[in-house]
Design a protein with these regions (language model features):
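Hydrophobic, membrane-interfacing alpha helices
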Residues: 1-264
Length: 264
């Protein structure tokens, strides 16, 4: 583990805080550049980014506290001390960004799905660095394990699943996959509508899917981790349904086409 990058006299540079700052910068820059290229007003883009960061910080911290309530307890001061009690939930950050986006869609008449696709590419560098920071500072561990990938974390006697490292690796694979398909998905025949939203829905669907097995190794009380599994599964199914509805395909048309081929 590497909780501290640099310590010189009264100055201490924490790994988690440093990677968090780098992630915020990369996210803001990528989103700003992509939305500017869409032709959106630059001052409105900056307002959107600032609101998204504030809401993302709030929701991600809130969800992380709920997920790890046995660690935080009823101590509001611990909830606010990011350095001594670090941790943010990736899905909370997504929620904050998309609440901000919804506000600008209503007020500024932005195209929701087209903007969401562009924003998605900016979120992943932040989320990856966030999970990597949790791993390096020793807070991103899961349940105890005897498997070969188990790691000893500071202050813990038993090997634990490197939960944050697994999350960071999964997010990197998803991000790489989205970059590879960005210029190709519109020519895929099975996605008939060619409508925007493909990238954002793919990202969310894969994240919910990966969160299901990760929930099994998360350190939480039984009712909490069962709730996480159920909620992620429901969210994944919802994304699949939404994906299908936006794809331009129809079960009714497919059935009629199959029926006509049999009668001819």
């Amino acid at each position: 583990m590497l909780p501290i990058i640099l310590s010189a006299g009264p100055v201490t540079l924490y790994t988690y805080g440093f990677l968090l700052a780098v992630g915020v910068f990369l996210e803001s820059f990528i989103i700003w550049r992509r939305l500017r290229d869409l032709g959106l007003k630059e001052e409105k883009v900056i307002d959107f980014i600032l609101l998204g960061l504030l809401l993302g910080l709030f929701f991600s911290r809130l969800i992380f506290i709920v997920q790890n309530f046995s660690y935080f307890g009823w101590h509001p001061l611990n909830w606010l001390l990011f350095v001594h009690y670090p941790g943010l939930a990736s899905l909370g950050w997504w929620l904050g960004i998309f609440v901000s986006l919804w506000r600008f869609v209503k007020v500024e008449k932005w195209d929701f799905w087209r903007t969401a696709d562009e924003i998605t590419f900016g979120l992943f560098p932040f989320l990856i660095l966030l999970q990597l920071g949790s791993f390096l500072d020793g807070s991103g561990f899961g349940r105890s394990t005897n498997m070969f990938w188990g790691i000893y974390f500071p202050g813990i006697l038993l090997k634990r699943h490197p939960l944050s490292l697994l999350s960071a690796s999964s997010l990197f694979v998803i991000w790489f996959f989205l970059i590879k398909i960005e210029r190709h998905w519109r020519v895929w025949e099975w996605y008939k509508s060619k409508e925007s939203g493909f990238i954002a829905l793919t990202a969310l669907g894969l994240i919910f899917l990966i969160n299901i097995p990760l929930a099994f190794i998360r350190e939480a009380k039984v009712y909490l981790y069962l709730a996480q599994i159920a909620l992620n599964f429901i969210a994944f199914i919802f994304i699949l349904i939404l994906f299908y509805l936006r794809s331009g395909r129809s079960l009714k048309k497919g059935y009629e086409k199959q029926k006509d081929s049999k009668t001819s």
